[in-house]
Curated annotation (Swiss-Prot):
Similarity annotation: Belongs to the GcvH family.
Chain's gene name: gcvH
Modified residues (N6-lipoyllysine): K65
Assigned keywords, A-Z: Lipoyl
Cofactor: (R)-lipoate
Cell membrane listed as a keyword: no
Pfam families, sorted: GCV_H
PROSITE patterns: BIOTINYL_LIPOYL, LIPOYL
Full protein name: Glycine cleavage system H protein
Domain Lipoyl-binding as annotated: residue spans: 24-106
Length: 129
């Protein structure tokens, strides 16, 4: 059973978002997603300054099992990326909701957040897989 923190919002494609004090959102992949993928070997992230559209592929998580596209859960500008993943992609496995975050985005349309899932809704998505 994967850990699904209640304070986060989730996309059905297994990304999570966490609101930060400056109004930006940190994005990563869920513990469930990293369990499915297995040991990470490489993470390709967007560039700081990139403009993302919700639902577009914007990063790649490559594991010993597969390479998986990571989708932007929100539209907006990339403010920061987790440079630690360049040398330590395994942080996604060891701390998916903490040190294994992917990037931060300043949303251009906060209404998109309403279309994301709460923890209960995300659990239902996992249960249907």
């Amino acid at each position: 059973m994967s850990n699904i923190p209640a304070e986060l919002k989730y996309a059905s494609s297994h990304e999570w978002i966490r609101k930060e004090e400056d109004g930006s959102y940190t994005v990563g992949i869920s513990e469930h997603a990293q369990e499915l993928l297995g040991d990470m070997v490489f993470i390709e992230l967007p560039d700081v300054g990139d403009t993302l559209s919700a639902g577009e592929d914007c990063a790649v998580a490559e594991s010993v099992k597969a390479a998986s596209d990571i989708y932007a859960p929100l539209s907006g500008e990339v403010l920061a990326i987790n440079e630690a993943l360049e040398d330590s992609p395994e942080l996604v496995n060891s701390d998916a909701f903490g040190d294994g975050w992917f990037f931060r985005v300043m949303p251009s349309d906060v209404a998109e957040i309403d279309s994301l899932l709460d923890a209960e809704g995300y659990q239902a998505v996992i249960d249907e897989e």
